[in-house]
Amino acid sequence: MRKRARIIYNPTSGKELFKRVLPDALIKLEKAGYETSAYATEKIGDATFEAERALESEYDLLIAAGGDGTLNEVVNGIAEQPNRPKLGVIPMGTVNDFGRALHLPSDIMGAIDVIIDGHTTKVDIGKMNNRYFINLAAGGKLTQVSYETPSKLKSIVGPFAYYIKGFEMLPQMKAVDVRIEYDDNIFQGEALLFLLGLTNSMAGFEKLVPDAKLDDGYFTLIIVEKANLAELGHIMTLASRGEHTKHPKVIYAKAKSINISSFTDMQLNVDGEYGGKLPANFLNLEQHIEIFTPKDVFNEELLENDTITDITPDKQ
């Protein structure tokens, strides 16, 4: 019996490129042995709804084609269910942090080849209160950049749009008094921002979590304490090289469970999208989602365990 695949795609991502090559993508997957269909999202929440429906229809494979926000919605549609389908990713967003972390090809057909090759690995995801994320959660004014940057600017200058918006927001930054409980530790004080990372790539910074593992059951927690603009600029420069972890204003730790609260209003960023406000409880769900990955993705820099398996569809 042929395996069934469902593509869930954002037609506006990547300058609408996926929509134009969709017929070729369907043919390529059909030739590889997948009975394939597609669904185009129209508004926020559509990808989650369709992922839930696809799960009920017992698809063997879901493919998320879009940015990190689309992938987040698909993960939220399947994360709570025991019979989760395997997940393929076609990175089509402005930054594609998760795709970068997995070393997925940036071209559509190359990403489909990864799916067809059939190598999968189990990766961690995070649970924040009642929703899920696959790459990062964060709080602080600067972390709002990804969802406050205008879409038009992103389409014109790509990832540089985030840097433009980030520099624009720097003067607005102020430290907030927060309480962060992480495993058996507590931080109580003023912080400019905090980040919980599951991968090594966040907001285009591929060395923000230089020792990230995708499957070890731990978040990487980064807290930037109260600092002036000069200190913050220095930290950001160091972060581009992965050298920020020893800065005196930076707390860098690993944790499985994290609770964050504040008496001050603080918005949250979840996989690059608005994620509500504090308080929040975070829990790492170890090796919870099975993702198609390149053959060479397993190495000590990315994965703690050799969890890769091979899947070959029936072409009959």
Curated annotation (Swiss-Prot):
A Gene Ontology term for the protein's cellular component: plasma membrane
InterPro entries associated with the record: ATP-NAD_kinase_N (IPR017438), Diacylglycerol/lipid_kinase (IPR005218), Diacylglycerol_kinase_cat_dom (IPR001206), Lipid_Phosphate_FormReg (IPR050187), NAD/diacylglycerol_kinase_sf (IPR016064), YegS/DAGK_C (IPR045540)
Homology family: Belongs to the diacylglycerol/lipid kinase family.
Cofactor: Mg(2+)
Job description of the protein: Catalyzes the phosphorylation of diacylglycerol (DAG) into phosphatidic acid. Is a key enzyme involved in the production of lipoteichoic acid by reintroducing DAG formed from the breakdown of membrane phospholipids into the phosphatidylglycerol biosynthetic pathway.
Keywords of this entry: ATP-binding, Kinase, Lipid biosynthesis, Lipid metabolism, Magnesium, Metal-binding, Nucleotide-binding, Phospholipid biosynthesis, Phospholipid metabolism, Transferase
Name used for this protein in its record: Diacylglycerol kinase
Binding site for Mg(2+): 213, 216, 218
Top-level taxon in the UniProt lineage: Bacteria
Molecular functions (GO terms): ATP binding; ATP-dependent diacylglycerol kinase activity; metal ion binding
UniProt xrefs under SMART domains: DAGKc
Catalytic activity as recorded in UniProt: a 1,2-diacyl-sn-glycerol + ATP = a 1,2-diacyl-sn-glycero-3-phosphate + ADP + H(+)
E.C. code: 2.7.1.107
PANTHER family: LIPID KINASE YEGS, SPHINGOSINE KINASE
Any one GO biological process: phospholipid biosynthetic process
Enzyme class: transferase
Membrane-spanning segments: none
Every DAGKc domain range: 1-132
